Amino acid sequence: MPSTKPPKERPYGKSKIRCLRCGTREAVIRKYGLYLCRRCFREVAPQLGFKKYY
Protein backbone atom coordinates (compact mmCIF):
# COMPACT_ATOMS: atom_id res chain seq x y z
CA MET A 1 0.00 0.00 0.00
CA PRO A 2 1.30 3.45 -0.80
CA SER A 3 1.76 5.79 2.11
CA THR A 4 -0.40 8.91 2.14
CA LYS A 5 0.50 12.38 3.25
CA PRO A 6 -1.48 14.02 6.05
CA PRO A 7 -3.94 16.71 4.96
CA LYS A 8 -2.46 20.15 4.41
CA GLU A 9 -3.11 22.65 7.21
CA ARG A 10 -5.10 25.58 5.85
CA PRO A 11 -4.69 29.14 7.18
CA TYR A 12 -8.41 29.93 6.76
CA GLY A 13 -11.73 28.46 5.63
CA LYS A 14 -13.95 25.62 6.80
CA SER A 15 -11.05 23.29 7.51
CA LYS A 16 -9.65 25.71 10.09
CA ILE A 17 -12.85 25.82 12.21
CA ARG A 18 -13.07 23.02 14.79
CA CYS A 19 -15.48 22.00 17.52
CA LEU A 20 -14.20 23.18 20.90
CA ARG A 21 -15.44 20.03 22.63
CA CYS A 22 -14.50 17.13 20.37
CA GLY A 23 -12.31 18.69 17.68
CA THR A 24 -14.25 17.58 14.61
CA ARG A 25 -14.44 19.84 11.58
CA GLU A 26 -17.89 18.71 10.43
CA ALA A 27 -21.18 20.59 11.03
CA VAL A 28 -19.74 23.29 13.32
CA ILE A 29 -22.27 25.80 14.71
CA ARG A 30 -20.60 29.21 14.84
CA LYS A 31 -23.67 31.28 15.64
CA TYR A 32 -23.41 33.23 18.93
CA GLY A 33 -19.73 32.22 19.08
CA LEU A 34 -20.54 28.63 20.10
CA TYR A 35 -18.07 26.77 17.85
CA LEU A 36 -19.62 23.38 18.69
CA CYS A 37 -20.46 20.60 16.26
CA ARG A 38 -24.13 19.69 16.06
CA ARG A 39 -23.65 16.51 18.08
CA CYS A 40 -21.92 18.29 20.97
CA PHE A 41 -24.46 21.12 20.78
CA ARG A 42 -27.36 18.69 21.29
CA GLU A 43 -25.67 17.38 24.44
CA VAL A 44 -24.95 20.76 26.05
CA ALA A 45 -27.90 22.83 24.72
CA PRO A 46 -30.00 22.55 27.93
CA GLN A 47 -27.13 23.85 30.06
CA LEU A 48 -26.65 26.74 27.63
CA GLY A 49 -30.34 27.67 27.97
CA PHE A 50 -31.72 26.55 24.60
CA LYS A 51 -35.29 25.59 25.51
CA LYS A 52 -36.00 23.52 22.39
CA TYR A 53 -33.64 20.79 23.60
CA TYR A 54 -34.97 20.34 27.15
Swiss-Prot record:
GO biological process, one term: cytoplasmic translation
MF terms (GO), sorted A to Z: rRNA binding; structural constituent of ribosome; zinc ion binding
Keyword rRNA-binding part of the UniProt annotation: yes
InterPro entries hit by this protein: Ribosomal_uS14, Ribosomal_uS14_arc, Ribosomal_uS14_CS, RIbosomal_uS14_euk_arc, Ribosomal_uS14_sf
SUPFAM superfamilies: Glucocorticoid receptor-like (DNA-binding domain) (SSF57716)
UniProt KW keywords: Metal-binding, Ribonucleoprotein, Ribosomal protein, RNA-binding, rRNA-binding, Zinc
Essential cofactor(s): Zn(2+)
Pfam families, A to Z: Ribosomal_S14
Gene3D superfamilies to which the protein is assigned, alphabetical: 30s Ribosomal Protein S14, Chain N (4.10.830.10)
Record-listed Zn(2+) binding positions: 19, 22, 37, 40
Cofactor binding comment, as recorded: Binds 1 zinc ion per subunit.
GO cellular component: cytosolic small ribosomal subunit
Assigned protein family: Belongs to the universal ribosomal protein uS14 family. Zinc-binding uS14 subfamily.
NCBIfam families registered for this protein in UniProt: PRK05766.1
Quaternary structure note: Part of the 30S ribosomal subunit.
Function: Binds 16S rRNA, required for the assembly of 30S particles.
HAMAP family given in the database record: Ribosomal_uS14_2_A
Protein name per its UniProtKB record: Small ribosomal subunit protein uS14
Organism: Pyrobaculum aerophilum (strain ATCC 51768 / DSM 7523 / JCM 9630 / CIP 104966 / NBRC 100827 / IM2)
